[in-house]
Design a protein with these regions (language model features):
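Solenoidal tandem-repeat scaffolds enriched in leucines and small polar residues
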Residues: 5-52, 60-63
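C-terminal beta-rich recognition modules with glycine/proline-rich loops and embedded aromatic residues
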Residues: 36, 96, 155-163, 168-278, ...
Length: 410
């Protein structure tokens, strides 16, 4: 199949490169990898092809502003990243770094996903993003993390999942928004700020389906793309805790089965406990944990020994002979922070979470419209309390811990 492909592909057709590289990893067939690189080189290098929308190599490297469908931006731009992982060619990584620098500078909203009214759009206070883009940029950020080892991409993945992704779906996963916004006041069948005709007016409401079905078919990728990067591997049996959340990791090292259980209420708490269970003799493991870039300081303790302090924005490694029953505790300092944005907004964060005003809601349940049913209804949501508040540039923020535990999204 791959050998029969045309060498000249256009835009999202080049996404087959990801599958070609994966097949190479299974087979070791160098011709597949060479053809994948050749397809991208023809498409992007030396001026690219005439059908290339925004992926000319020189434009990507120079971080030129981008005007293209958001999904196309996320899915095509990760192809040089994947090629870099398999070939080590620096020019592939340079193209992706320049491209995502432009997305961050021109388009990225407070929840980690770029503004996209189908096409990428300049960021502003009321800007929207398509739910497809949430899934796809999380996917691409995962490859950026693999390629660069830079914690900023893990930070973006957490921001996108814990804010944009979970804000765009209902708790029961039966309804979603086509367009969502960090600064949204209405979610009704007539409220979309990017209407795309009469049928498109409902795209900011929570519904099981829309006039087009791309987001309903793509939303399932959000969490697998996150979970598949929570635990990663390095060289020499290195185990990397890259993204945080309750989880379990199992592997085998030199004949010893190792299970690491991560206990945490992150992102609501910075206390993360890793419990090691081994079924045999102690084994030497480089165990690496991410220290997010928003942290002022973090403390790391092994078996309740004297803690060590770490600073923000890197990966910290403990290399030791781990034995059954060992406990590693990471305490990430979560302090509220107010960040002023270039679009005149002020965002309030604590840890990876973007905070908002708690607004009372009026909820109308719709069961008799096209693509709705009793089992899968749609919802019109409007505010039932005041929402029009402003913040000073340097607000004083007090954290009140109510003692609640668990995850409010489920």
């Amino acid at each position: 199949h791959f050998s029969a492909l045309n060498d000249t592909l256009t835009n999202r057709q080049t996404c087959i490169i990801e599958s070609m590289c994966k097949m190479y990893s299974y087979t070791g067939d160098k011709e597949i990898l060479q053809k994948a690189g050749h397809i991208w080189d023809l498409f992007s290098m030396n001026g690219g092809t005439k059908d290339n929308e925004v992926f000319i190599h020189g434009d990507m490297v120079s971080s030129k502003p981008i005007d293209v469908h958001g999904v196309t931006a996320a899915e095509v731009s990760k192809q040089p990243l994947i090629l870099y992982l398999y070939t080590g060619r620096q020019e592939y990584l340079d193209a992706a770094l320049g491209f995502y620098s432009s997305v961050e500078r021109e388009n990225e909203l407070p929840d980690g996903i770029p503004a996209s009214y189908e096409s990428l759009f300049p960021k502003h206070a009321e800007a929207l993003h398509e739910t497809c883009d949430i899934s796809d940029f999380i996917w691409s950020y995962g490859y950026m993390l693999m390629a660069t080892g830079d914690v900023k991409w893990a930070d973006k993945m957490e921001s996108a999942v814990y804010n944009a992704a979970l804000g765009a779906i209902n708790k029961d996963f039966k309804a979603l928004q086509y367009f969502s916004s960090p600064n949204q006041l209405l979610a009704t069948e007539k409220s979309s700020m990017a209407p795309y005709g009469e049928e498109g007016l409902s795209r900011q409401a929570y519904r099981p389906g829309f006039d087009v079905e791309c987001c309903s078919g793509n939303v399932h990728r959000m969490f697998p793309n996150y979970i598949s990067r929570m635990w990663m591997n390095g060289d020499e049996h290195e185990i990397v805790a890259a993204l945080y959340g309750p989880s379990e990791y199992r592997t085998e090292i030199n004949g010893t089965k190792v299970c690491i259980t991560e206990d945490t209420s992150y992102p609501f708490s910075g206390k993360i406990t890793f419990r090691f269970a081994l079924d045999g003799a102690p084994v030497r493991i480089p165990f690496t944990m991410r220290i997010p870039s928003w942290v002022e300081n973090a403390k790391l303790t092994v078996n309740a020994e004297q803690p060590k302090e770490y600073h923000a924005g890197g990966f910290s490694t403990i290399e030791r002979r781990f034995k059954d029953g060992d406990v590693v505790e990471l305490d990430i300092d979560m302090k509220p922070r107010a960040e002023k944005r270039t679009d005149a907004g002020i965002n309030v964060y604590m840890g990876p979470l973007l905070y908002s005003v708690d607004i009372d809601e009026n909820v109308e349940i719709i069961k008799d419209q096209f693509k709705t049913s009793v089992a899968f209804p749609a919802y019109n949501v409007t505010p039932a309390s005041k929402w029009n508040f402003g913040l000073p540039e340097n607000p004083e923020i007090t954290v009140v811990n109510t003692g609640k535990k668990g995850f409010p999204w489920t």
